Swiss-Prot record:
Superkingdom: Bacteria
InterPro entries assigned: PRC-brl_dom, PRC_barrel-like_sf, Spore_YlmC/YmxH
NCBIfam families registered for this protein in UniProt: spore_YlmC_YmxH
UniProt-recorded name of the protein: Uncharacterized protein CA_C1697
Annotated family: Belongs to the YlmC/YmxH family.
Residue ranges crossing the lipid bilayer per the database entry: none
PANTHER family, per database record: SPORULATION PROTEIN YLMC-RELATED
One Pfam family cited in the UniProt record for this chain: PRC
């Protein structure tokens, strides 16, 4: 049996949507990977940039367990536990 799979490049072009509000959260910027367990821990989305072109936005980190469905062109997530990374 073949399991559904997606490349990182394909996933980076999928819109991420919060299933609770219907809000478009954006596109995947990066993945956080556990290199000892060989699994994805979370996806990282660019945060909104308030204050101009050169301002740094706060990234949004979504735990992999909060991903509800990966479709053909969209990723549905439970946005109840969004974490804003203020690096």
């Amino acid at each position: 049996m073949d399991l559904p799979s997606h490349s990182i490049n394909a996933m980076k072009s999928m819109e991420v949507i919060d299933i609770n509000t219907g809000t478009k959260l954006g596109l995947i910027k990066d993945l956080k990977i556990d290199t000892e367990e060989y699994k994805v821990i979370s996806i990282i989305l660019p945060g909104s940039k308030v204050g101009g072109w050169f301002s740094k936005g706060n990234d949004i980190e979504i735990d992999w367990t909060d991903i509800q469905k990966i479709g053909v062109d969209v990723i549905l997530v439970n946005g109840d536990n969004l974490f804003v990374n203020k690096d």
